[in-house]
């Protein structure tokens, strides 16, 4: 649920109290936003699998007919980040095999259809919900995965790239699509319409850095994670080159670089680099 707190951690009232106390202490609160996919337990997806083919509910996600004589094969050759096809077939209410849905990550994380204006409108409401509660911004998970090439075509080089991408080569059909930038510009307008300083940081695994810089232009994200720096070996010359490349790329668009050394996907640097 994008508009509630997991009961494991408390209630919305607890959240409001935390935000108020944090602000008293001069701290800022960013909400972690996951826009590429929902849980398969989310009411939107439950409505989608209960809905008919071609319904408005299914249009929230990427549902397609399978290939093969009986639709038994995935709709395209995309690979999940966790292995295997990026597609799972549902079972219809009458027990017959149904359509397939796209999930770039786990099968329990169906990808939303960001070409659908209803999805865009829903998330604008989610942003406002948290901004109205006083949060200072958002850390946006996997924004580079939101857009998909029209028609969801096969990956032309899946044998080499797998579920990822090859730096310096054309973007694969499931990553880095230009269609996401108008969405981020609209989000930035929403943040800028609120008083005070609000920030939007993207966990966008986009390389090279000159390409990543396009995501932090003045009307899009305020910052992105600097994965070039995060992935750099802990050697002086490599770090020196990474820092210089970062300044050059981000200065070109008037944005600050970030100096992140670990996150929830990367072992903490004290352990990774600390040795004894």
Segment roles from a protein language model:
Residues 1-276:
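Active-site and adjacent substrate-binding regions of carbohydrate-active enzymes
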């Amino acid at each position: 649920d994008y508009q509630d707190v997991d009961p494991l951690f408390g209630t919305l009232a607890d959240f409001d109290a935390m935000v108020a106390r944090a602000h008293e202490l001069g701290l800022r609160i960013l909400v972690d936003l996951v826009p590429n996919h929902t849980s398969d337990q989310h009411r939107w997806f439950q409505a989608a699998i209960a809905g008919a083919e071609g319904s408005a509910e299914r249009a929230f996600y990427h549902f397609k007919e399978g290939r093969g004589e009986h639709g038994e094969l995935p709709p395209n050759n995309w690979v999940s980040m966790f292995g295997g096809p990026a597609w799972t077939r549902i079972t219809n209410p009458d027990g017959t095999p149904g359509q397939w849905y796209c999930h770039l990550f786990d099968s329990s994380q169906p990808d939303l259809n960001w070409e659908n204006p209803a999805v865009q409108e829903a998330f604008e409401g989610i942003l406002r919900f948290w901004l109205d509660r006083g949060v200072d911004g958002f850390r946006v998970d996997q924004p580079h995965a939101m857009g998909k090439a029209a028609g969801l075509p096969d990956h032309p080089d899946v044998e080499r790239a797998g579920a990822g991408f090859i730096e310096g080569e054309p973007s694969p059909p499931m990553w880095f699509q230009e269609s996401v930038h108008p969405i981020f510009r609209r989000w930035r307008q929403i943040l800028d319409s609120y008083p005070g300083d609000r920030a939007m940081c993207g966990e966008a695994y986009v390389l090279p850095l000159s390409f990543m810089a396009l995501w932090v232009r003045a009307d899009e994200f305020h910052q992105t994670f600097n994965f070039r720096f995060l992935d750099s070996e802990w050697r002086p010359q490599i770090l020196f080159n990474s820092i210089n490349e970062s300044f050059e790329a981000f200065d070109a668009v008037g944005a600050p670089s970030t100096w992140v050394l670990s996150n929830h996907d990367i072992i903490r640097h004290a352990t990774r680099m600390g040795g004894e």
